[in-house]
């Protein structure tokens, strides 16, 4: 396991889980990264609470290749596109845990891009092990158990700063993967990066704690590991994010930018 000492030296803020629609969570990532770049906020971790089922596709993925759009509509899943790369994630209220970290790239200087994923998720692996979950890291960007994938991470890098976020399956109807994500099906578009086919191994296979209880445990783990102080989203950050939802993240021009 690789870990940069500089990550430990940052003065972290922790934004506890708060519920928002899927497009709003995407917009908040961009707003908070831009605030960090502009010097309006320090390094932070934000925990998400999902308020609706969502299919979250990576920035460089084709909607047609990745998502069964008819199935998504029938099952009530919102399709949204994040600013970072990586594969498609199924996210559901009370079943999915997500966190985002916003930090200067200097904190992961001296280690490779691949190693930065493990360094930034090392605390989460330890948090799961504390719950007797047999978790470990698999390059490039997965937290796993001996039975499959628990979580996947993705990054975006902008102007010397990093957005790193990780999505964790607390519980899941594994049949949804085949219904909603077009892994293994024929390409409908020549564009875009495909998701990898991996067995899912939810945390609920190993712990009786609820999704909210695991989230609270992870927040405490991060606080203890990094001496983080609790913070909150400001009214101006929320207002700016709502504006980005309207002008970008909820628009077909963004969601279908790689058809």
Provide a role label for each language-model segment.
Residues 1-70, 74, 78, 82, ...:
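Active-site loop/lid in soluble adenylation, ligation, and acyl-transfer enzymes
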Residues 69, 89, 94-222, 247, ...:
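Catalytic beta-strand/loop module used to bind and position nucleotide/cofactor moieties
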Residues 76-96:
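Glycine/serine-rich anion-binding loops at beta->alpha junctions
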